[in-house]
Structures are given as C-alpha cells and as structure tokens.
Amino acid sequence: MQFKQWITHLGVGLLAATFAISSQAAIWSSTEVHLSNGDLLNPFAKKNEDTTILTFQHASGSKYVDNFFFFDQAYVKNKGITSYMEAYSSFSLGAITGKEISYGVIKDVGLIAGINMATDINKMWLLPGFRLRFDLPNFAFSNLDITSYNHVTTSSEDEKNEEESSYMVDFNWALPFEAGGLSWSLEGHAEFLAGRDMKHGDAKYENSILAQPQLRMDLGKALGYEANNLYVGLEYQYWKNKLGQKGQNESTVQLLSVWNF
C-alpha cells in the first residue's frame, strides 16, 4: 500500500473513531435535512443550471471534541445526480489541557482535522489545521478555521490529476435574532481557498472565495408548533472562480427549507 493511501485510510479511520467516541458523550447535537433550489453555475460548461440539493447535516459536541458533517446530493435538471461530503472534528486545547486559552474575543484554540470527498469524481482532500473560537455578542457560535488543503490520490487514474497542496481559511457562524415577532437565524460560512497547480501538466486552480449565508425563519414556531424544528428562508451563494476556474463567478439566491431534529 502506498504511503499516501495509508495516510488517507488512517485519517479517515481517526475521523470515524472520533465521531463514534464523541457521539457517546455528546453534550449537544443537531441534525438537519436541507432542501434548496436555484440556478447554479456549472464552471466547466460556463452556464447556469437548474439545481436541487438535498443535504443531510449533523453537528455535535462533547467536552473535548466538536464534530460537523454534511452530505450533499445535487440533482441537475436533465443531467442526473452528483454527491459531495465534508466532515470535521475540532479538539479543544483548553479542555484537553485543563487551562484557559483565551485572549480578547478569542475564547479557545483547537486543532481541527477534516476530510472532503467528491464521490462522483472519486476525489478526496485532507484538511489538518487549527481553529479559533470566538466569543461574539449574540452569536450562537463563531469560528475561524485555518487548514492546509491536501489532495489525496485514491487510484492510479487519480494520480494523473494530482494537485499540489494549498491552504484554506474559513469563518463559520450562527446568529439567532428576533424581528417582527418572528424568530430568525443568519448563519453560514465564508471561505478562501488558495490556488494550486496540478503536479502533471500546466493546468491550475485559481484562488477562490465562497460565501454561503443563510437567512432562516422559524416557520414551525410562527405557526404555533415547537420551535427549532422547521425553517424556511433563502441561501445566497457567492463563488469567485468557482471550483478554481478562472473568471467563473457565481452570485445566486436559492430557496431553502430546513428540518431540524
């Protein structure tokens, strides 16, 4: 077995073990199903396509570890389905060492390990790095993640499209608020992914910026049912140099519904 394949299997195994162990001692957890629809840019065909995305998302936390996972199934009209997933585990250095690690609005520092997989094209990336946890007024959470971005080849065919390593910076947050007698939440993430060259040939991926803020309204609560179960709203997606393709910029609004359980 090649060294990189061994590292890949080890990384996936450690993430799976972390999820399994921490889920047994979870202090909190949230599981959601998202359904969204909009005209999304295909940066390779250079045109917008009617796309419906079904997302399964889970987050949980214990004293030492926070986990986050999502799996997307995207249906492109008249073309079929593609799949994509991301998973991250973040380890609190303050909790692990038993010492407060804070400064100003930074309330903790953690180590983070992530894996991204585009299953339909059989590509995988590993993202080790660190996390800054912020204590911002009224925010449910706010984090800044800084990781390396490492393409891992999973087959001899994949080696032909092997990428150089780069890095990613991601700010993720949730801000609940009340307005007009209704309960809302503004949440999402914004990331910068540094460009990278292909190891074979002259092709390259450009620097890209992706922002996906969601504005959600608690529809269940508004209708007199239990709060924090059913949301409706909008997701705005801005993507500069989408998927690393130079000049392929996206700015679109998607309809969004969320079931939380």
Feature names for model-found ranges:
Residues A45-D50, Y75-S83, N116-L127, S155-S165, ...:
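Solvent-exposed loop/turn segments connecting transmembrane beta-strands
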Residues N249-F261:
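Outer-membrane beta-barrel "beta-signal"
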Residues H151-N229, W259-F261:
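Outer-membrane beta-barrel transmembrane domain signature
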